[in-house]
From Swiss-Prot:
Record GO terms (molecular function): GTP binding; GTPase activity; translation elongation factor activity
Stretches for region G1: 13-20
SUPFAM superfamilies reported in the protein's UniProt record: EF-Tu/eEF-1alpha/eIF2-gamma C-terminal domain (SSF50465), P-loop containing nucleoside triphosphate hydrolases (SSF52540), Translation proteins (SSF50447)
Protein name (record): Elongation factor 1-alpha
Predominant localisation class: cytoplasm
Keywords: Cytoplasm, Elongation factor, GTP-binding, Hydrolase, Magnesium, Metal-binding, Nucleotide-binding, Protein biosynthesis
Record's subcellular location: Cytoplasm
Species per Swiss-Prot/TrEMBL record: Metallosphaera sedula (strain ATCC 51363 / DSM 5348 / JCM 9185 / NBRC 15509 / TH2)
Region (G5): 193-195
Residues at which Mg(2+) binds: S20
One Pfam family, short name: GTP-eEF1A_C
HAMAP family assigned to the protein according to its UniProt record, in alphabetical order: EF_Tu_A
Length: 435
């Protein structure tokens, strides 16, 4: 394990905007892929006549390796810069990418947003159906304020390497991000050609007009978020493994507090208590885990079937809250008609995804002031924000955003799209007996 400070990075962006190629190039330039793997990927890409996609092939190779080897390794892409040790969360290109992005983004410290400069591709990413828009909204909801916008495929802009095209894209995205409340001093824009590595780790000879940082330099300008070590322990479960000779090994990231070997913990909403026998991260044993650590931990007295993804771990002295009902401030980002009482989207919060019924629309808010504009409206439409009460269909752990931000912000999904995003103001707890 590197002694450098550690950051979790997520790579987001519209399909075909060059996420995989960018990540592959970065890992290769930083020397975190061996020659043999690179050669094999190049040959595989050549065979299929997709030479320009050799870096994307590299990632797929890594993905297969991960699927074959059942390690407790949540993430498989790690690299170092001069200043930091990075883990890349969840390779892009998943069928359930947005769903995974929601759970992944809730664990990330910063994001790289890949945006293609190719004519038509940028425009489709920013269309109403586009994922560039959707991913920007989700990144903001999930509390990701540090974003590096990589404007990719500058070599196929028209004309190639065109500064005007770069500026046009930058201005459009800046305007959109500002409208969602991003602090633009924490957002960097970089024109990139991943396939040749221009402005990834080395400066581009073709874009002399750009004098900002390379991607690698921008990564070193990121800041480490403060660790909430003084708060109670909260660890949402990402996966649960059963490993022969070891036992049950849940995996997840510590969001707040500290977990130590020997601690008495409880899994909610299951209400199952256990003792922590060992903790490890990236195959290194730890005596204690702090916020930001992606860990696998072995527990005594728990069967694999007792716990699942979306459960939250806390100490028995301060168990995570299970909500009978919760109240949130919601923005409707997409809906063909309107949302009324009884509407039941799937709520994605930390690593959980549970259908929740709208039990009351308390008030519609004035978008300019955020103050109440109408009490108990019949419905809310796209672009509107409101205070809404939800009732989870199945037991669900959530917390007030002001107490535990990662467990207090969520996205609502329906019909394969993000319908809305929200922040929880209040939770009515349900009584769960600890076994």
């Amino acid at each position: 394990m590197s002694q450098k400070p550690h950051l979790n990075l997520i790579v987001i962006g519209h399909v075909d905007h060059g996420k995989s190629t960018l990540v592959g190039r970065l890992l290769m330039d930083r020397g975190f892929l061996d020659e043999k793997t690179i050669k094999e990927a190049e040959e595989a890409a050549k065979k299929l006549g997709k030479e320009s996609e050799k870096y994307a092939f590299l990632l797929d190779r890594l993905k297969e390796e991960r699927e074959r080897g059942v390690t407790i390794n949540l993430t498989f892409m790690r690299f170092e810069t001069k200043k930091y040790f990075f883990t890349i969360i969840d390779a892009p290109g998943h069928r359930d990418f947005v769903k995974n992005m929601i759970t992944g983004a809730s664990q990330a410290d910063a994001a790289i947003l890949a945006v293609s400069a190719r004519k038509g591709e940028f425009e489709s990413g920013m269309s109403l159906e586009g994922q560039t828009r959707e991913h920007i909204i989700l990144a903001k909801t999930m509390g990701l304020n540090q974003v590096i916008v990589a404007i990719t495929k500058m070599d196929v802009a028209e004309p190639p390497y065109d500064q005007k095209r770069y500026n046009e894209i930058k201005e459009t995205i800046e305007k959109f991000m500002k409208s969602f409340g991003f602090d633009m001093s924490k957002v960097k824009f970089i024109p990139i050609v991943s396939i040749t590595g221009e402005n990834v780790t080395k400066r581009s000879e073709n874009m002399k007009w750009y004098n900002g940082p390379t991607l690698e330099e921008a990564l070193d300008m990121l800041e480490i978020p403060p660790k909430p070590v003084d708060k109670p322990l909260r660890l949402p479960i990402q996966e649960v493994y059963s490993i022969s000779g070891v036992g049950t090994v849940p995996v997840g990231r510590v969001e707040s507090g500290v977990m130590k070997v020997g601690d008495k913990i409880v899994f909610m909403p299951a209400g199952k208590s256990a003792e922590v026998r060992s903790i490890e991260t990236h195959h290194t044993k730890l005596e204690k885990a702090e916020p930001g650590d992606n860990i696998g931990f072995n527990v005594r007295g728990i069967d694999k079937k007792d716990v699942k993804r979306g459960d939250v771990v806390g100490h028995t002295t301060n168990p995570p809250t299970v909500a009978e009902e919760f109240t949130a401030r919601v923005i409707v980002v997409w809906h063909p008609t309107a949302l009324a009482v009884g509407y039941t989207p799937v709520v994605h919060v930390h690593t959980a995804s549970i259908a929740c019924r709208v039990s009351e629309i308390v008030a519609r808010l004035d978008p300019k002031t955020g103050k109440e504009a109408e009490k108990n409206p019949q419905f809310i439409k796209q672009g509107e924000s409101a205070i809404v009460k939800f009732k989870p269909i199945k037991p669900l752990c959530v917390e007030k955003f002001s107490d535990f931000p990662p467990l207090g912000r969520f996205a609502m999904r329906d019909m394969g799209k993000t319908v809305g995003v929200g922040v929880i103001n209040d939770v009515k707890p349900s009584k769960i007996e600890i076994k």
